[in-house]
C-alpha cells in the first residue's frame, strides 16, 4: 500500500487549513453560497436532502486498519454511527455538520486520507479490481499504475475545471472486475509479440443520463507513454468538450460526436508534442511507486482440504463457495465480507462494524483491506488454515451472509432517503427484494445475478449494467421504478434494455420474482440469468411480467 512522503502529507494538511478558513468565511457570511460551492466540492462536500454528505477518497479501494479505525471514530463522533461504501470504492458520511467538516478532514489527514477531488468537474478517484495484487488470473498488478495516475491527477492545474467530472479505471486481470468499458478512460494491460508491456486504451464509456459503452482507441500503448497519452486525451477533452450544457459535457458525448477514429487522431496529434517529454515514464519512476506494493510476508503453506469442515459445517461450506476467491499464493485465499444482509442498506457499516473490520484485518490479513465497487469489503490475504476461525468471527460481526454474486448482493445508491437528486428511494426496494429472496437454498439455485438499483438517471447504482437494473422515476410526484434487463459491466459490456412501463414500489418484489421464474423455467444446465436472457431475449420476460392475471 502506498505510504505518503513528506510532500504528500504537506499537501493534505495545507488543504485542511485552506478549507477551514473557507468554511469559517462562509459561515460568517463573507462568502456567498455561489462562491463557496466550488470550494466545498473540491473537498468532497455535497449538500444532500437532509444534511451535507462528505465523500472520503479511498484510492483504488486500499485501506489499512488504522485508517478504518479513524473512519469508525468519524462515524461515531460526527455522523449517526454509519459509513457507506460507494460504487467507486470511496467512503461516504451522510450526516456531518458543515461546521465539523474541517475537523473531520484534519482527522483524516492524520492517517493519510482526504476528500480531495471526490466531487466536482475534475479527475476523480482511479478505481481497479478489488483483488488487485492477489488475483489468480492477474496479468499485472494494476495498483502501482493506479498510484502513478493518482499522483498525476492530484491538483493537476490544467484539469481542475474540466467540462464535467472524469473517471479512470484500470484492470489488471483476464476477467474485467474494474468495469473499464463504462468509464471515461479504461485501461487494461497487454503484451506485444516481443513480450513488452503496454495498455489497451478505451475512451468514452459511462452511465448516467446517456449510457455508453466505451471504444478502444489504442490497442497497444507502450507503458512509458501512459501519462503522456492520458494527458493528450484530457487536452482534447478540455479543448473540445462542451461547457454550455452539463448534460452533454461528458467525454462520451464528445467521442460520439467526433467518432472514436477522429478523437484518436486528435489525441495522436497532441502526442506529437508530448511523446518523449517530461511526462514520459521511466523504469526508475515505476519502481519508485512499485516498491510500495511488494507482497506481504507470506508463509510457505499448502492448500487446505476443506472436505471435513464442509461436511461438519454446511453453513461454512455454503459461505466458502460464494465469499472466497482463489489467491495467487498456495495456502491463501481472498475473502469478501458481505455488506448485504437482509434488512441492511447495501454498503452500510456501523462504527462498531468498522472497528471490527480493522481488528479482523490485523488478525487475518496483514492489517489491510479493500473496498469493492459492489459495495463490499475484502480481506485479500487470509491463510486457508484460518478460514473457519474467520468465518465464525464474521458471523458474529454480521459479515458472513453467503450471497456474493447472487441476487441479494445488490448494488444500490443511497437514493431518496438521502440524495437531493433522487427521484425515488432505492434502499426500500433493495430490502423488499432481499426479504422476498431470503431462502438461501433458492438463492443458490438461482445462481449468479447482478441486480443494480439507482434512484435517478445519474446511475450511481449502475442500473444500466445490471443483469437486472432498476431505476427510480417520478410520475406526478409519485415514486415508480423502471426495470431493464441484459446489462453487463464485465468484459464485453452491454447496456440493459427497458422492459416496459414502470412499476409502483409495492409491486417491485413481485416483478423480480416473475423475472426469476421465467429464468428458472427457461434456463439450461449451468446457464446464468444473463446467458438465458441473451439466448431467449426480452420478450418472454415482458410477457410474464405484464400478463394481466399471471
Summary of predicted features, one role per range:
Residues 1-550:
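Peripheral terminal and linker regions in Fe-S/redox and tRNA-modifying enzymes
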Amino acid at each position: 500500500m502506498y505510504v505518503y512522503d513528506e510532500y504528500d502529507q504537506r499537501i493534505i494538511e495545507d488543504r485542511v487549513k485552506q478549507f477551514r478558513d473557507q468554511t469559517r468565511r462562509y459561515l460568517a457570511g463573507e462568502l456567498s453560497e455561489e462562491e463557496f460551492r466550488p470550494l466545498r466540492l473540491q473537498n468532497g462536500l455535497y449538500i444532500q436532502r437532509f444534511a451535507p454528505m462528505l465523500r472520503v477518497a479511498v484510492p483504488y479501494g486500499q485501506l489499512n486498519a488504522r485508517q478504518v479505525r479513524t473512519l469508525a471514530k468519524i462515524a461515531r463522533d460526527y455522523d449517526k454511527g454509519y459509513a457507506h461504501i460507494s460504487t467507486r470504492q470511496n467512503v461516504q458520511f451522510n450526516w456531518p455538520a458543515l461546521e465539523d467538516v474541517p475537523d473531520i478532514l484534519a482527522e483524516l489527514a492524520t492517517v493519510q486520507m482526504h476528500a480531495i477531488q471526490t466531487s466536482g468537474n475534475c479527475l476523480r478517484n482511479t478505481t481497479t479490481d478489488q483483488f488487485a495484487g492477489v488475483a489468480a488470473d492477474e496479468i499485472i498488478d494494476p495498483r502501482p499504475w493506479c498510484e502513478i495516475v493518482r499522483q498525476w491527477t492530484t491538483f493537476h492545474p490544467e484539469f481542475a475545471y474540466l467540462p464535467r467530472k472524469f473517471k479512470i479505471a484500470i484492470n489488471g486481470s483476464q476477467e474485467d472486475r474494474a468495469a473499464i468499458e463504462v468509464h471515461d478512460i479504461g485501461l487494461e494491460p497487454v503484451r506485444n509479440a516481443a513480450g513488452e508491456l503496454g495498455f489497451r486504451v478505451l475512451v468514452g464509456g459511462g452511465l448516467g443520463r446517456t449510457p455508453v459503452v466505451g471504444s478502444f482507441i489504442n490497442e497497444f500503448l507502450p507503458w512509458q507513454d501512459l501519462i503522456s497519452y492520458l494527458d493528450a486525451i484530457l487536452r482534447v477533452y478540455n479543448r473540445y468538450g462542451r461547457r454550455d450544457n452539463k448534460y452533454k459535457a461528458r467525454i462520451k458525448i464528445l467521442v460520439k460526436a467526433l467518432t472514436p477514429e477522429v478523437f484518436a487522431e486528435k489525441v495522436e496529434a497532441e502526442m506529437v508534442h508530448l511523446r518523449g517529454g517530461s511526462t514520459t515514464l521511466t523504469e526508475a519512476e515505476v519502481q519508485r511507486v512499485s516498491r510500495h506494493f511488494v507482497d506481504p510476508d507470506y508463509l510457505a503453506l499448502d492448500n487446505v482440504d476443506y472436505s471435513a469442515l464442509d461436511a461438519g459445517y454446511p453453513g461454512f461450506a455454503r459461505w466458502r463457495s460464494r465469499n472466497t476467491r482463489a489467491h495467487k499464493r498456495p495456502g491463501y485465499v481472498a475473502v469478501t465480507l458481505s455488506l448485504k444482509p437482509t434488512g441492511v442498506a447495501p454498503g452500510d457499516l456501523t462504527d462498531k462494524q468498522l472497528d471490527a473490520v480493522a481488528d479482523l484485518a490485523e488478525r487475518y490479513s496483514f492489517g489491510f483491506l479493500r473496498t469493492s465497487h459492489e459495495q463490499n469489503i475484502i480481506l485479500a490475504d487470509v491463510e486457508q488454515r484460518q478460514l473457519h476461525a474467520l468465518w465464525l468471527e464474521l458471523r458474529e460481526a454480521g459479515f458472513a451472509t453467503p450471497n456474493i454474486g447472487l441476487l441479494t448482493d445488490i448494488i444500490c445508491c443511497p437514493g431518496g432517503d438521502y440524495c437531493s437528486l433522487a427521484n425515488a428511494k432505492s434502499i426500500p426496494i433493495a430490502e423488499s427484494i432481499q426479504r422476498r429472496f431470503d431462502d438461501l437454498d433458492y438463492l443458490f439455485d438461482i445462481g449468479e445475478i447482478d441486480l443494480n438499483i439507482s434512484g435517478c438517471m445519474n446511475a450511481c447504482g449502475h442500473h444500466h449494467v445490471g443483469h437486472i437494473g432498476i431505476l427510480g422515476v417520478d410520475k406526478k410526484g409519485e415514486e415508480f421504478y423502471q426495470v431493464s434487463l441484459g446489462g453487463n459491466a464485465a468484459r464485453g459490456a452491454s447496456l440493459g434494455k427497458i422492459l416496459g412501463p414502470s412499476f409502483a414500489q409495492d409491486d417491485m418484489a413481485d416483478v423480480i420474482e416473475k423475472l426469476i421464474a421465467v429464468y428458472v423455467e427457461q434456463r439450461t444446465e449451468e446457464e446464468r440469468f444473463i446467458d438465458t436472457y441473451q439466448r431467449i431475449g426480452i420478450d418472454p420476460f415482458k410477457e410474464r411480467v405484464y400478463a394481466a392475471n399471471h
